[in-house]
Amino acid sequence: MNGTPDYSVFLAAYYKAADPSLTQQAIGSRANLGTQAQVSRLLAEARAKGYLREVFEFPADMPPDERRELQRKLELSFYKEHAHLEAALAQRARNLCRTRSDGGNPFKRLHVVATPDWHEGDEKARRDAFGAFGANAAEIVAGYVDEADSCSVAWGRTIDATVQRIRSDRKPPGPGKVFMPIAGEPINYEPNGVSPSDAARILAAAWTGSEPPLSLRGGPARIPKSVYEHDRDGIAREMASYSKNYRRIFARPGGLIENVAMILTGIGDATTSKRTGEQADPWYWETADAEDPDVLGLAVGNIGGVWIARDGLDESDTRKVEQVNKRWLGAQHDDFRRCSLSGGESGRPGVVALAVEPAKATIVLEALYLVNVLIISRQLADTLARELLGANQE
């Protein structure tokens, strides 16, 4: 790239994009960038170069290795406990892999994204928080997608807020990328945010030269328990496989999901997923309606539709959670495990998970054995830091 500005320009732009309410004097103090006048000059240069618009963006022609190194420096400056929390999360992932026979690859990378505060019941502030998170996470997600030749993507408001803010006309090196949905859609509920097929379409449009995105619009997300129990011949699953796109993605063996380089997903916990109205998770409610009323209480939450059983369940209750997953028609636990095991290899980011709300701390800690990259809000990072590093962490 030509005319690379110094680190101070990037740092000033990063702080301003992360929290637009910060004054120039505050940025100078927090980032150790000098006086208000000095910060003003740095921000002016960042705007002139196009690195600071509505959100922080790296130069489009910055080499990937240089961008990753700079991203790391900026994040360590912005969130002071970043290195300690990342190390604690990695240790937690290793512990899970040792204690769970179905464990995947250890966690590799944490990104903490600036997000405005909000309070329960203030829906406007919550929308603003999700929007800011998505705007600030988009550049990080795009960097990982740049590396991958294929990407399976999930659903929801966090995914929506992020993929909508990825700048368009990104040009992948080599053959076009393949984007695919992680699952079909609820039969009885409208998608809230984006569906997996919507998200795949948005991503394909952002990367010039990608293959036409695969779609499962109109295809079911799961087999209801009441249907499954009477379907001795597997007709319901065969009906889902009538879709050519479904077969291309999920055929066993040989489906694209078996060798996907990246899974981009949110994480759902039972508490926040139970909300109704604008905050509802239609995929949760579809599952709750299709299964026994109390069975989801046996799980701590889900990652991309795969439910994770609570610790300490007896064999019977654990089997109930496994059966819920068996009736899921999207990516399976083994698909997440396979993707996470290969994560970190060249061109394979693995499982990249997004989460905003502090209430999701428990499911994040339980799902780490399937996650390679975790992108979270500052508020959730603070909650995880208190859990893993001690009660006095701020």
Q: For the regions a protein language model found, what residue spans apply to each?
A:
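Short glycine-rich or small-residue beta-strand-to-loop segments that form or flank ligand, phosphate
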Residues: 27, 149-155, 180-185
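Conserved phosphate- and dinucleotide-binding cores of soluble alpha/beta proteins
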Residues: 2-14, 18-28, 32-33, 37-103, ...
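Short, acidic/small-residue loops that bind anionic groups at enzyme active sites
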Residues: 161, 169-190
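Helix-turn-helix/homeodomain-like alpha-helical modules used for DNA recognition
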Residues: 71-165, 370
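Residues in well-ordered beta-strands of folded domains
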Residues: 111, 180, 355
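Acidic/polar, low-complexity linker and loop regions
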Residues: 109-117, 183, 214, 340
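Nucleotide donor/acceptor-binding cores
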Residues: 148-149, 175-177, 349
